[in-house]
C-alpha cells in the first residue's frame, strides 16, 4: 500500500503507477483552529509506504507525517516505511552555537517514536543524519537522474559552487565522462578574498553548477557571475532539492543562468526530474 500525504501526493501517485499498485485514498484537512485532521479511507495491513517531503511549511508537513505513521500502526500496518524525499530540518545536524537544539536529531527521534520502521530519503544534506536513527535509513542519490537529464549538452563541465558540493558534482561528471571542478575562495590580500574556479578552464564550455539544495540562491548567483566572467558559453544550474526561498529563481536567472533544473522532492516551477523511480526501486527490493 502506498499513501501520499499533502506535500507529495503527485510523487506518491507516480511511485504507485511505476509499481502498478493502488494509491490509498486519504483525507487530510485542517480544523478552523488550524489543527490537523487525517483519515485513511481503506483497510490497512501488511507493509505501507508513506510519501511525504517535510519542506515548507515544515512544521505542518512533519506533523502530518507523524500523525499518519502512528495512525497506520494503530490501524494494523505491520511495517511502515517513511519515504521522505526532502528531509526538513536536516541542515541543523549539530550545535553551531551553545544552547541550540539539534533539530535533525529531534526529528529523527519523533519519526521513530511515531512508529516508522524504515526511512527512505534522497540526498541528505549531511551524511551524519542517518546516525541519528536506530531504524534502517536508505539514502538515495538523484545525481544519476540529473546526469541523464543534462546528457544533451555537447561540451559540459560540472562545477560545484563550493567544496562541500564537490562529491555531488563528481558523481555527475563521472557518469557523463566530463571534467569537474569547484569554486574556491582564495585570499589575495589581508583584506581581499576572491572566489574562482579552482583549476579548470571553462571558456567556451557549457558550465553546469550542481548542488544538493538551492535555498536563497546566493551561492548560485555568485558562481554564475564568476563563470560568466570566465567565458562559459552557457550556464545551467541543477539541484536535487529546490527550496527556492522568496525570489531565489528570479535572482538566479538575472545572474545569467540559462536554465535551472531540479527534482520533484519539492514542488517548484523547475522540478523537471522525478525521483519516483528511485523510491519505486527501493520498494521492489
UniProtKB/Swiss-Prot annotation:
Mg(2+) 2 binds at residue 162. GO terms for molecular function: ATP binding; kinase activity; magnesium ion binding; ribose phosphate diphosphokinase activity. Pathway: Metabolic intermediate biosynthesis; 5-phospho-alpha-D-ribose 1-diphosphate biosynthesis; 5-phospho-alpha-D-ribose 1-diphosphate from D-ribose 5-phosphate (route I): step 1/1. D-ribose 5-phosphate binds at residues 187, 211, 215-219. PANTHER family: RIBOSE-PHOSPHATE DIPHOSPHOKINASE FAMILY MEMBER (PTHR10210), RIBOSE-PHOSPHATE PYROPHOSPHOKINASE 2 (PTHR10210:SF32). It is found in: Cytoplasm. ATP binds at residues 33-35, 91-92. It catalyses: D-ribose 5-phosphate + ATP = 5-phospho-alpha-D-ribose 1-diphosphate + AMP + H(+). Binds 2 Mg(2+) ions per subunit. Its EC number is 2.7.6.1. GO terms for cellular component: cytoplasm; ribose phosphate diphosphokinase complex. Disulfide bonds: none annotated. It comes from Methanothermobacter thermautotrophicus (strain ATCC 29096 / DSM 1053 / JCM 10044 / NBRC 100330 / Delta H) (Methanobacterium thermoautotrophicum). SMART domains: Pribosyltran_N. GO terms for biological process: 5-phosphoribose 1-diphosphate biosynthetic process; purine nucleotide biosynthetic process. Belongs to the ribose-phosphate pyrophosphokinase family. Class III (archaeal) subfamily. Mg(2+) 1 binds at residue 125. Pfam families: Pribosyltran, Pribosyltran_N. Keywords: ATP-binding, Cytoplasm, Kinase, Magnesium, Metal-binding, Nucleotide biosynthesis, Nucleotide-binding, Transferase. Its cofactor is Mg(2+). Involved in the biosynthesis of the central metabolite phospho-alpha-D-ribosyl-1-pyrophosphate (PRPP) via the transfer of pyrophosphoryl group from ATP to 1-hydroxyl of ribose-5-phosphate (Rib-5-P). This is Ribose-phosphate pyrophosphokinase. The active site is at residue 185.
Amino acid at each position: 500500500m502506498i499513501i501520499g500525504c499533502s506535500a507529495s501526493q503527485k510523487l506518491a501517485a507516480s511511485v504507485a503507477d511505476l509499481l502498478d499498485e493502488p494509491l490509498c485514498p486519504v483525507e487530510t484537512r485542517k480544523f478552523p483552529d488550524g489543527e490537523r485532521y487525517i483519515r485513511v479511507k481503506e483497510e490497512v495491513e501488511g507493509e505501507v509506504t508513506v510519501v511525504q517531503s517535510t519542506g515548507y511549511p515544515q512544521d505542518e508537513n512533519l506533523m502530518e507525517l507523524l500523525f499518519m505513521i502512528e495512525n497506520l500502526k494503530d490501524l494494523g500496518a505491520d511495517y511502515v516505511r517513511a519515504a521522505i524525499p526532502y528531509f526538513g530540518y536536516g541542515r541543523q545536524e549539530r550545535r553551531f552555537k551553545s544552547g541550540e537544539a539539534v533539530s535533525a536529531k529531534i526529528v529523527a527521534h519523533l519519526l521513530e517514536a511515531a512508529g516508522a520502521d524504515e526511512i527512505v530519503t534522497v540526498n541528505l544534506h549531511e551524511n551524519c543524519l542517518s546516525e541519528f536513527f536506530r531504524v534502517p535509513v536508505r539514502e538515495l542519490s538523484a545525481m544519476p537522474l540529473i546526469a541523464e537529464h543534462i546528457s544533451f549538452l555537447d561540451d559540459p563541465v560540472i562545477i560545484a559552487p563550493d567544496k562541500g558540493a564537490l562529491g555531488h558534482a563528481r558523481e555527475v561528471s563521472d557518469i557523463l565522462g566530463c571534467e569537474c571542478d569547484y569554486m574556491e575562495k582564495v585570499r589575495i590580500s589581508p583584506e581581499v578574498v576572491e572566489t574562482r574556479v579552482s583549476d579548470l578552464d571553462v571558456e567556451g564550455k557549457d558550465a553546469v553548477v550542481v548542488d544538493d539544495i538551492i535555498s536563497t540562491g546566493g551561492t548560485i548567483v555568485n558562481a554564475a557571475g564568476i563563470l560568466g566572467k570566465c567565458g562559459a558559453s552557457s550556464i545551467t544550474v541543477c539541484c536535487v532539492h529546490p527550496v527556492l526561498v522568496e525570489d531565489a529563481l528570479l535572482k538566479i536567472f538575472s545572474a545569467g543562468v540559462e536554465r535551472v533544473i531540479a527534482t520533484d522532492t519539492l514542488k517548484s516551477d523547475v522540478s523537471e526530474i522525478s525521483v519516483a523511480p528511485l523510491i519505486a526501486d527501493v520498494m521492489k527490493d
